[in-house]
């Protein structure tokens, strides 16, 4: 594969990744309605949703930064393909603490929900965020 085709491929891939990351926010209002959140659960639900949104937005920002770094690397005559792996590792490490925090908040919320609500919430997470919680 020629360098030009390789650059084009990676550029298109990065554009797709950045658009996908920015469109990744699920409809948490819909989840709240499906869960029928009670007043004593509302505060933890809001905290959980906030921490989840922060983690997802961090992925979007990291994807944009990743795209910029890779675009700069691909513009070189001899791109360093190891830079792709380093940039990916940096992105994962940058967002890992936010996903841990979000996971901890979901566990706290589960403790307040009844069994049916927990199943609804877990189904929602698998459906909308499965790529992040595998």
Language-model segments: which ranges?
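Bacterial N-terminal signal peptides that target proteins for export
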Residues: 1-10
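Charge-rich (acidic/polar
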Residues: 3, 20-134
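N-terminal signal peptide c-region/cleavage motif recognized by signal peptidases
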Residues: 16-18
């Amino acid at each position: 594969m020629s360098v030009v085709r390789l650059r084009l491929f990676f550029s298109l891939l990065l554009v797709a990744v950045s658009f996908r990351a920015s469109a990744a926010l699920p409809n948490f209002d819909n989840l709240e309605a499906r869960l029928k959140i009670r007043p004593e659960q509302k505060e933890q639900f809001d905290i959980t949703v906030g921490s989840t949104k922060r983690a997802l937005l961090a992925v979007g920002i990291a994807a944009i930064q990743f795209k910029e770094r890779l675009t700069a690397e691909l513009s070189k005559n001899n791109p360093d393909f190891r830079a792709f792996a380093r940039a990916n590792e940096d992105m994962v490490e940058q967002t890992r603490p936010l996903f841990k925090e979000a996971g901890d908040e979901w566990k706290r919320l589960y403790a307040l929900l009844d069994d049916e609500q927990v199943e609804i919430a877990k189904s929602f997470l698998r459906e909308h965020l499965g790529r992040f919680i595998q």
